[in-house]
Amino acid sequence: MKEQIQFTTSEKYKDNVVLRLSFEFAIRIVQFSEILEEKRKYVIAKQIIRSGTSIGANIKEAQNAESKADFIHKLKIALKEADETEYWLFLCNSINSYPNCDELIKQLQPILKLLNKIIGTSKNNIKQ
C-alpha cells in the first residue's frame, strides 16, 4: 500500500482530494526539476518548478478565499498554472535530450479535470 504523504495538519483539508493530488504532483515536479538541473536544463527546470508547484499553492490559498468569486479566481489561477505546466512537460517530451515525463503528464490530468469541475460547479452555484 502506498504511504500517505502528509500535506496538511488541518482536519479541514485532510479529505481535500485536489489539494492532496496537487501536493503529490508538486513533489514529483521538484524531483523532475532536479533531474533537469543535473542535465543542465536550467531554464526549463525553473519554468516547470515555478508553474508545477504553484498549482497546489493556489489551491491551498483558495481554501481561505474571501468570497466565492475570490475562490473561483484563485482556482482559475491554479488551472492556468496547470495548463502551463502541461505545456512545458509536452515540450520536454518533444525534445530528445530531455527525460521522458509521460508519468507527470498522466498525473496532472486528474488535477486538471477536478479544477475544471470545481470551477464550473462554483460558477453555477453563484448563478443560483
Language-model features, listed with the residues they occupy:
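Short, C-terminally biased terminal segments at protein or domain edges
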Residues: 1-58, 65-128
